[in-house]
């Protein structure tokens, strides 16, 4: 009567088996003590030997039927067939020797019972080839112990027959002394044996029939094969042989050993300090095989040691270099990658485990601030490490570290710009005067672009992403810091001698322009447009991505182009104006963009194309064409003009008295090499985009005689010339080789008046 571990001991279960054992052993003992001695002397000594052998055989089979495993199937795990527990049908059919046998789902053991298997309600187990649960042996009778139960019945029946028979012999021989003790005890044993003889003999006969027919008690009672064919029968002889002589079926449930494991695990399986407190391993067996679930409970010591372990189990951070030192391999920045850094220090605070994949935060000052009078070190005086370049202090700010673009990309790279000359400085000063005067008179404020002579190399935008235009301490880039740098670079800062400023190379510049030292901005001689400090804009684009910044820049360029076109239209159809042509390109291509990435973005017409057009009556006035062509030749020869003529022209412009030419004319000497604009240009367009027209409304007056003698001008009637306004008719050359004019020369006297704030006005009298 095996019991599963953990089940409680119930005394009521052992009353039948204890009674059966007591009656069996007690009656047999009394028989051997009081009856067998006389039978040995009177009948034969073989009588006690025979009864003794049968009695031992009964006890052996009784013990085997009681304590042997009947063939219990182990229960399924809680999670083994969890889905099948809800979706499985109640029955399944299997084919046994060509006959369909139904299997039922066991809700307790969580599997389909095999054929001839049944769940015992007393033992609460599924037993293979379940016959019945016998209370006299306190065990289920199944495949593994049915043989011993059957032999117990046979031997017990034989023993009871022998006890009753030999006891009857003894009583018949002692009939005159029934009151004697021996006769009374023999009669009591016969009564007990006779009392149990009828059921035992009946039960033995019943099982003999079941064995010969190959059935079990459960199948016979339930009537499974009552009207059909039993697929499990082997014939009469085969069935008896299978029950008595077949090998013992295997056992499916193995109880865990009660003794602790003698073998002790050593490293690397367990740590040495936890061997003493390690819990025993638990091994679970199932019908599907051995399950490798070695569950080990965690002891308090192991949990304490887990608390002592560091939580940061990630890869270690790279070693820190000494502050202010850079490796030998970090001296030259790579020109192919975008270089940007905010701090020259390489030390960073320790990174927590949850932030170990974020960029390091430098602990030193970001970008050193220098006043207007201080000098800031340029990129040529500082060598940056590779890791300092790429470890930006951008936690949530966009990174401007853009890669170089190919010609098919967003923007094209440009060749390095030529060095500035003195003509750039003077031409910039003259344009500053004309721009301020035009702005005072109500004209549109248009950003002046650097003028470039024909045939010269294209000038890239300087000062757009200069070293002094880096983001401030928190790493944000503002609209003003991108377009209006605060302080010139290329100098040293006495306030911060040890800190360096990292340079930023724009993706729109040529790679060859990275290593060039920054050029100082042109000094303007205008008292109005001098350098004045400007507060940065409060609006900042801190958390914008590259795409948004590019769209903002494109919109700014589009607005600039529209403003240029409006200014051009106003100058074409206004009363008076000033025309500054970057080169002698055709006006017909003014609104067309360049096909190549290196071509100019906008092309404006020259003076000869503008005057020779249909609106200017070039076809109807050949003299006007001759005058304008002379101006174009003077413009193309402007870079070769000597500095003496340039200074003379500047002196004439600044003279307080009358000067040659009207206020609407400009000397061709001004068409020199390009100079940087007062307002930075957009990096999206690098061609010679022209500031086409700056118009001023000036009253006209007759010119002086000196102007008549020195510079013969193109005279136009006061009303219109060939249907055009007077301002457009005065587009002839201001200085050039004398030639015949198209109409009588018109002479005006120009006076120079100084206004408020140092502004100089040119008034025609």
Curated annotation (Swiss-Prot):
Broad class of where this protein is predominantly found: Golgi
Domain DHHC: 104-154
Subcellular compartments: Golgi apparatus membrane; Mitochondrion membrane
Enzyme Commission numbers on file: 2.3.1.225
Name of the top EC class for this enzyme: transferase
Its biological purpose: Palmitoyltransferase that catalyzes the addition of palmitate onto various protein substrates and therefore functions in several unrelated biological processes. Through the palmitoylation of ABCA1 regulates the localization of the transporter to the plasma membrane and thereby regulates its function in cholesterol and phospholipid efflux. Could also pamitoylate the D(2) dopamine receptor DRD2 and regulate its stability and localization to the plasma membrane. Could also play a role in glutamatergic transmission.
Name the UniProt record assigns to this protein: Palmitoyltransferase ZDHHC8
